[in-house]
């Protein structure tokens, strides 16, 4: 399954570069800069508020005259592997099977691996009247610990995980059979399911550009106590428009706190250098915006002045649409049995450099330091593997000449002629390293064949009624030479349960690649004039994020849940309760 073979004709016919139109490229760069600007200010992808409940069974009895008095403590593993305490339950007296009442509220972010460590302690009787947060843990008796990713809990059909408790030294439960079990149950908050659709319109905006009208966009930010407002949503940029109407903005109540929590709506004139000019801003709650819609009234923007006052402007903001609906969430689909299936395609063209030389993008460092391709595979794969039950991933290479064969633009990374799957992320890494020594780097850079191979798998799965959504990661160092063929493949694939993540490595000019990312411009159009039914591409240049606060995996995966939900809604597919 998933086998793809040499495409000699494509290779011979695509040796020259194919350029996009200047306007499309400019539009792509424009919104790419906007996305980077927002992410630098804290804008993240879809998230859900999760409530974790705890109980335990068969805990070890460490008290002589009574049963243990257990308390559970939760830690979050940070990037540097240190543990930060984030929660303590109450103490349950005299119980080896406690059911704690206190809940742990955590924000689930799909694009990161949120590793949690749970430790259970027997609280000494002499501390019975002390507040839990004042207890010194080194003065309590340790009963056992367990570790898991938050995604492992919420992807189970029952949203309940039973974890074996073990000693801190890592001894297996079989060696110490009396540590007991910790049961964790997850519930998604109702606020995660309430979606507000808002259509904003403005009138009489000030022109900030010298020779043209402003290019306005809106950013909606929530207000946090003692902190900088955090962006939670944005509109597209409207070119040369002083009376713009934007596409709908979707907000969940939890994103802003509550319906009565104030939000700041800023209207700015876009500049490609990232220095956007503020046109004006307003501060209102969702309830206020609903009232404006019902009354058909606008509200005037204001601008802060140097004297600490606000200057009221003639420019106004209107709410043309305001509707609230309870919708199915990403987590509801996962709990009902939907899976995300990971696939990867790796660029083996000669522009990567000789793999045996240290300056090659494909160089395998004997010290174990990962190259850019290995980092992208690990970073994305480590997140997505939790959503795939069998963890068998199709893996391809393109742009190379296998031994005694012509140049192939889609060959199985494992060397097989009949199947493309490998076992786990480590299987991809091993096959990638092996392939480097079994193929000759060639060219040109063609995406069409690997996209079509992924689309064939997604199409077959859809025909079988499988509850699977596929995610293809393409890692490349160069500009594609089959731009129109790639557009055709993407437009066709937009009807399938498939998203495509593209990572650009090295120093190439990736402007043409940004054209493929439809959220940075108009929808893709095929050579026959057909438009893509939805956006399925997310592109990130590794150099743009590797030194910032936003990781490549966050930048890539932030939009994936939204793409998944868009597909489900277009096809009217609903999660069937477990």
From Swiss-Prot:
Official protein name in the record: Protein BONZAI 1
Molecular-function GO terms, alphabetical: calcium-dependent phospholipid binding; metal ion binding
UniProt KW keywords: Calcium, Cell membrane, Lipoprotein, Membrane, Metal-binding, Myristate, Plant defense, Repeat
Residues that hold Ca(2+) according to the record: 63, 69, 122, 124
Task performed by this protein: Negative regulator of cell death and defense responses. Negative regulator of several R genes, including SNC1. May have effects in promoting growth and development. May function in membrane trafficking and in fusion of vesicles with plasma membrane at low temperature. Exhibits calcium-dependent phospholipid binding properties.
Bilayer topology annotation: Lipid-anchor
Cofactor(s) the protein needs: Ca(2+)
Effect on the protein of changing residue 215 to A: No effect. Loss of function. Loss of function, but no effect on targeting
Phenotype when changing residue 124 to A: No effect. Loss of function. Loss of function, but no effect on targeting
Family: Belongs to the copine family.
GO biological process, one term: response to humidity
SMART domains: C2, VWA
Organism annotation: Arabidopsis thaliana
Effect of residue 69 to A: No effect. Loss of function. Loss of function, but no effect on targeting
Further remarks about this protein from its record: Overexpression of BON1 has no effects on pathogen resistance.
Domain writeup: The N-terminus (1-116) is sufficient for plasma membrane localization. VWA domain fragments interfere with the function of the full-length protein, triggering a lesion-mimic phenotype.
Keyword Calcium: yes
Gene name tied to this protein: BON1
Annotated knockout phenotype: Dwarf, twisted leaves and enhanced disease resistance in cv. Columbia when grown at 22 degrees Celsius. No visible phenotype when grown at 28 degrees Celsius, or in cv. Landsberg erecta, cv. No-0, and cv. Wassilewskija at any temperature. Humidity and temperature sensitive lesion mimic phenotype, accelerated hypersensitive response (HR) and increased disease resistance. Bon1 and bon2 double mutants, as well as bon1 and bon3 double mutants are seedling-lethal when grown at 22 degrees Celsius. bon1, bon2 and bon3 triple mutant is seedling-lethal at any temperature.
CDD domains in the cross-refs: C2A_Copine, C2B_Copine, vWA_copine_like
Lipidation (N-myristoyl glycine): 2
Tissues and organs where the protein is expressed, per its UniProt entry: Expressed in roots and flowers and, at higher levels, in leaves and stems. Strongly expressed in growing tissues. Not detected in green siliques.
């Amino acid at each position: 399954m998933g086998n793809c073979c040499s495409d000699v004709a494509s290779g011979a016919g695509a040796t020259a570069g194919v350029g996009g139109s200047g306007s499309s490229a400019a539009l792509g760069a424009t919104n790419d800069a906007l996305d980077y600007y927002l992410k630098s200010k804290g804008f993240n992808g879809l998230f859900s508020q999760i409530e974790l409940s705890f109980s335990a069974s068969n805990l070890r009895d460490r008290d002589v005259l009574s049963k243990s008095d257990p308390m559970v403590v939760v830690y979050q593993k940070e990037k540097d592997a240190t543990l930060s305490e984030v929660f303590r339950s109450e103490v349950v007296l005299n119980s080896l099977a406690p059911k704690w009442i206190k809940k742990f509220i955590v924000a689930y972010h799909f694009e990161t691996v949120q590793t949690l460590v749970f430790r259970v302690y027997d609280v000494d009787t002499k501390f019975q009247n002390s507040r839990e947060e004042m207890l010194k843990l080194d003065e309590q008796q340790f009963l056992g610990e367990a570790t898991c990713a938050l995604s492992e809990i919420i992807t189970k059909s029952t949203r309940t995980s039973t974890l074996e408790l073990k000693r801190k030294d890592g001894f297996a439960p079989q060696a110490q059979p009396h540590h007991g079990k910790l049961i964790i149950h997850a519930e998604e908050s109702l606020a995660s399911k309430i979606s507000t659709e808002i259509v904003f319109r403005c009138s009489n905006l000030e022109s900030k550009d010298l020779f043209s009208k402003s290019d306005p966009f809106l950013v909606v930010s929530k207000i946090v106590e003692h902190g900088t407002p955090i962006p939670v949503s944005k509109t597209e940029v409207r070119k040369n428009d002083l009376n713009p109407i934007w596409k709908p903005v979707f907000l969940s109540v939890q994103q802003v706190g509550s319906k009565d929590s104030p939000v700041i709506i800023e209207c700015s004139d876009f500049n490609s250098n990232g220095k956007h000019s503020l046109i004006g801003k307003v501060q209102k709650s969702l309830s206020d915006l609903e009232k404006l819609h019902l009354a058909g009234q606008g509200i005037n923007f204001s601008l802060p002045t140097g004297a600490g006052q606000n200057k009221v402007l003639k420019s106004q903001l209107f709410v043309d649409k305001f509707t609230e609906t309870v919708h199915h969430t990403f987590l509801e689909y996962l709990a009902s049995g939907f899976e995300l299936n990971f696939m990867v395609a790796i660029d083996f063209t000669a522009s990567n450099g000789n793999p045996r030389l240290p300056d090659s993008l494909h160089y395998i460092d004997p010290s174990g330091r990962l190259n850019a391709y290995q980092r992208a595979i690990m970073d994305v794969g480590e997140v997505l593997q939790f959503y795939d039950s069998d963890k068998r991933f199709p893996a391809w290479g393109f742009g190379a000449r296998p031994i005694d064969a012509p140049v192939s633009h889609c060959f199985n990374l494992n060397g097989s002629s009949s199947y493309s799957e490998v076992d786990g992320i480590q299987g991809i890494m091993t096959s990638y390293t092996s392939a480097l020594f079994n193929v000759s780097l060639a060219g040109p850079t063609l995406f069409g064949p690997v996209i079509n191979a992924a689309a064939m798998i997604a199409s077959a799965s859809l025909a079988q009624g499988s509850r699977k959504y596929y995610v293809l990661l393409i890692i490349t160092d160069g500009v594609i030479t089959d731009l129109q063929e790639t557009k055709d493949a993407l437009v066709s694939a937009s009807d399938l349960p498939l998203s495509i993540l593209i990572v650009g490595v090295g120093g190439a000019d990736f402007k043409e690649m940004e054209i493929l990312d439809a959220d940075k411009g108009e929808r893709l159009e095929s050579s026959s004039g057909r438009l893509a039914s939805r956006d399925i591409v997310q592109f990130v240049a590794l150099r743009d994020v590797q030194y910032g606060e936003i990781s490549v995996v966050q930048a890539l995966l932030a939009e994936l849940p939204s793409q998944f939900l868009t597909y489900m809604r277009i096809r009217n597919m609903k999660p069937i309760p477990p």
